[in-house]
């Protein structure tokens, strides 16, 4: 009961969004980072403390006044050693350092001028995170107020410390600043996000996504020997079950062989890694994450694109500050639009309006264009000459734009694809324009005698056997009426031969009519012998 009251009191009196009363950072029972070597970052806590490089101390044992404007909220820090160069202290160094940082410039040379800064990969340093968020907030408030209302408030320093404790890593300073401005998005239920329909995660969702990928690593990507040992505990329960069908035992190695990165060697060759902290997610199992364990040619804190649809990982930005600046620039470019049906925010990267790729695909395409990576030619699904003769064609390397399938074993999304060869040819594949094999099938020959001609001859023969007779009457007072034989409607559809005989038939009909008028039927029983 006392613990519940403490939690309620802490929620009412603090601005913490995720940290609780039992946080190790609050009670002094903090367990140091890298307690789990497999989940620790490659750096130390010095990367998240702006005052750690200050070599000067105040008289009371505290650091300079800069320590009050750090991620630790002005908490007293431990005494720091003397300058690294070993030089003696001279009067005025502390005041000179404070006056330098009171100006608008962060870095000054000893002469008082702004030094030249090294470009990173040919580009200048990114703008501050606060400046990028100011542009994004201004755009969202003017163009999409509903989306602007979903942006969360900034988290506190205690929340960030608790997040680092749960993830067992040290987050970059620009990411900590970004979370203090906007702690992700509220879960409003709309299928849209501030990162062009992709959801910006808060601290709690970051931990959830990280745990999901951690579970994938533990249950699927571990050594099969370890998995077998873990499954021995449930052998008694599974003894009565049927044996599972034989599966490919080398699928883990085949999956790892497919993993690649752009640029090469910038990301570790892995399907998922515990040092990849998800920051943005789409609705298909893909994430933008900060990489805390980069490859040999990568940079700590780079933003990468990984997920179930990306065996090839992409470095989309050098840091989180670079990525926010890129998003702000895309929003200010005027190429955005909102889908009227789904209310999704999208970016029109291409001129063709019928092409509407997701923002993740646009980032992938930009990286391919930047590093000159093109897609391999897709295989034709039409049967080739080698397959027709029973010989297998040599395998070609898989394309990054194709689905990660091999040997008819689909992985990932359940797409409807043809499992066998198809006689249909696509315009973008070789063999387009060739006649289809169905066009070479011999059809049944039509009969030599026309059906219409045979019907017309039968109708003409039946018309010749008809004759016009008067109706017999019992009384002679009434005038005799003529009986006219109606011609059949199908007789109108006669061939050219019947049309030539038409005058003769009409003449014979008139003669028969005149003769019938003169003939008198004396006995009514004679009508029975007449063939009509």
Curated annotation (Swiss-Prot):
Family matches, as Gene3D superfamilies: SMI1/KNR4-like
GO cellular component: cell division site; intracellular vesicle
Biased composition (Basic and acidic residues): 475-516
Keyword Transcription regulation recorded: yes
Bias (Low complexity): 381-393
GO annotation terms (biological process): cell wall organization; fungal-type cell wall beta-glucan biosynthetic process
Region of interest called Disordered, as start-end residue ranges on this chain: 374-532
Family in the record: Belongs to the KNR4/SMI1 family.
Protein name: Glucan synthesis regulatory protein
């Amino acid at each position: 009961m006392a613990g519940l009251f403490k939690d309620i009191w802490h929620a009412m009196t603090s601005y913490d969004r995720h940290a609780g009363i039992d946080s190790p950072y609050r009670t002094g029972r903090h367990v140091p980072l890298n307690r789990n070597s497999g989940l620790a970052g490659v750096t130390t806590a010095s990367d998240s403390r702006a005052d750690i490089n200050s070599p000067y101390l105040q008289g009371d044992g505290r650091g300079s006044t800069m320590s009050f404007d750090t991620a630790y909220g002005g908490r007293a820090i431990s005494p720091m050693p003397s300058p690294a160069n070993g030089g003696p202290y001279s009067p005025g160094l502390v005041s000179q350092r404070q006056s330098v940082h009171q100006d608008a410039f962060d870095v000054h040379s000893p002469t008082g001028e702004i030094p030249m800064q090294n470009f990173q990969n040919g580009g200048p340093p990114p703008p501050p995170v606060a400046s990028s968020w100011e542009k994004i907030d201004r755009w969202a408030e003017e163009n999409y107020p509903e989306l602007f209302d979903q942006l969360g408030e900034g988290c506190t320093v205690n929340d960030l410390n608790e997040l680092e404790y749960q993830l067992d890593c040290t987050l970059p300073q620009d990411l900590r600043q970004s979370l203090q401005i906007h702690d992700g998005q509220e879960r409003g239920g709309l299928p849209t996000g501030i990162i062009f329909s992709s959801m910006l995660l808060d601290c709690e969702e970051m931990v959830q996504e990280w745990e999901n990928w951690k579970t994938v690593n533990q249950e699927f990507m571990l050594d099969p020997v370890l998995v077998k040992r873990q499954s021995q505990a449930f052998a008694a329960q599974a003894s009565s079950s049927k044996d599972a069908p034989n599966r490919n035992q080398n699928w883990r190695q085949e999956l790892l062989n497919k993993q690649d990165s752009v640029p090469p060697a910038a990301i570790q060759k892995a399907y998922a890694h515990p040092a990849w902290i998800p920051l943005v997610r789409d609705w298909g199992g893909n994430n933008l994450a900060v990489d805390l364990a980069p490859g040999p040619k990568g940079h700590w804190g780079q933003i990468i694109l990984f997920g179930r649809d990306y065996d090839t990982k992409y470095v989309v930005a050098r840091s989180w500050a670079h990525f926010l600046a890129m998003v702000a620039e895309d929003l200010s470019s005027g190429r955005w639009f909102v889908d009227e049906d789904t209310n999704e925010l999208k970016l029109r990267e291409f001129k063709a309006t019928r092409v509407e790729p997701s923002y993740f695909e646009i980032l992938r395409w930009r990286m391919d264009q930047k590093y000159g990576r093109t897609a391999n030619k897709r295989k034709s699904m039409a049967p080739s000459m080698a397959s027709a003769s029973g010989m297998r064609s040599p395998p070609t390397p898989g394309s990054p734009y194709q689905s990660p399938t091999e040997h008819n074993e689909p992985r990932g999304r359940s797409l409807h694809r043809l499992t066998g060869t198809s006689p249909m040819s696509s315009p973008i594949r070789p063999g387009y324009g060739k006649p289809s094999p169905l066009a070479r099938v011999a059809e049944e020959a039509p009969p030599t005698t026309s059906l219409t001609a045979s019907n017309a001859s039968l109708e003409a023969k039946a018309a010749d056997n008809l004759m016009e007779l008067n109706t017999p009457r019992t009384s002679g007072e009434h005038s005799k009426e003529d009986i006219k034989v109606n011609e059949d409607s199908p007789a109108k559809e006669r061939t050219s031969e019947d049309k030539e005989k038409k005058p003769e038939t009409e003449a014979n009909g008139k003669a028969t009519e005149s003769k019938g008028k003169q003939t008198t039927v004396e006995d009514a029983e004679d009508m029975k012998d007449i063939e009509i």
